[in-house]
UniProtKB/Swiss-Prot annotation:
Keyword Transcription attached: yes
PANTHER family: IP14615P, MESODERM POSTERIOR PROTEIN 2
Record keywords: Developmental protein, DNA-binding, Dwarfism, Notch signaling pathway, Nucleus, Repeat, Transcription, Transcription regulation
Species for this entry: Homo sapiens
Residue windows of the Sequence repeats: 179-180, 181-182, 183-184, 185-186, 187-188, 189-190, 191-192, 193-194, 195-196, 197-198, 199-200, 201-202, 203-204
Subcellular location: Nucleus
Biased segments, Low complexity type: 32-48, 58-71
Span list, region 13 X 2 AA tandem repeats of G-Q: 179-204
bHLH domain: residues covered: 81-135
Any GO MF annotation of the entry: RNA polymerase II cis-regulatory region sequence-specific DNA binding
Protein name, entry field: Mesoderm posterior protein 2
Amino acid sequence: MAQSPPPQSLLGHDHWIFAQGWGWAGHWDSTSPASSSDSSGSCPCDGARGLPQPQPPSCSSRAAEAAATTPRRARTGPAGGQRQSASEREKLRMRTLARALHELRRFLPPSLAPAGQSLTKIETLRLAIRYIGHLSAVLGLSEESLQCRRRQRGDAGSPWGCPLCPDRGPAEAQTQAEGQGQGQGQGQGQGQGQGQGQGQGQGQGRRPGLVSAVLAEASWGSPSACPGAQAAPERLGRGVHDTDPWATPPYCPKIQSPPYSSQGTTSDASLWTPPQGCPWTQSSPEPRNPPVPWTAAPATLELAAVYQGLSVSPEPCLSLGAPSLLPHPSCQRLQPQTPGRCWSHSAEVVPNSEDQGPGAAFQLSEASPPQSSGLRFSGCPELWQEDLEGARLGIFY
């Protein structure tokens, strides 16, 4: 029988089989072909399949050990976190307590807690209690004083107040003071509003009588310009003696004649003085106001020149301002000598007892006393223009 080639030849021919190391080294001592055939009949795949079979139990054991150790680690993790969080909370609490005690020590006086002295927590709390008791006794907030206050007040204590104060006194007093201040502020606001309303109403009610109030003063002066002539006194048709003194300027359109009195009554004559070149007239004071003597306004040079240029007739007498009257024997009309001014007068001058030379003119003099004269219309002495039907009086500027 032919012997099987040595294993070296097999290794040379089939090097790819043994290169993987599949366990053929145990069959190198076999000399029988059957054994070789048996050995060759056994496929290396079977050996490969049989060898890894013991490995799964080892892997499973390792996985079981790892699974057994993993829950232990997971169980120990939360316990350590809880211990750490508890310690952190304790540290935070101690820090907060130390901060609060340090803040409390700041309010203690140096006599109780000197600056360089270290105090424990218990000592700090005891000193604070003593200091608070001392302040309560000084301020009258002791238990005895509070009981006396409660007895005095009884059940009438107000529910409002400071919750920290036992008697709720300071807060209640402050609340009452605020309520009083608000009430006073509202009363003042209402009083101011009423005062403004009353002031406006009085101003509107007294506005029509403003001219009369101004004219009732001791002296007055006419303004520089006016839109037109104002009305004459209310009692025009009664008589000259009852009328209030009032003044009219000379050169004003729609002007009315001043009040005149008879020649015989000199004491009751009113003073009629033309103001300083005012183109409008002032209304006389109302009858309800008492007459007040007026101060004659100074006549200007222009008015003096105008009055000097006027010629008069001897029959009626017209007194303007305080001029000296020089009558003329012949009846003449008033003719202006100043250009731009036109005078037309239907009244006549009343002659005095003594006639003087012709060419008489008005002379303005501030120092001369006022003379009384009356303006007589044809046949009707001491009457106003409105009471006469045939008389005409027109002054144009």
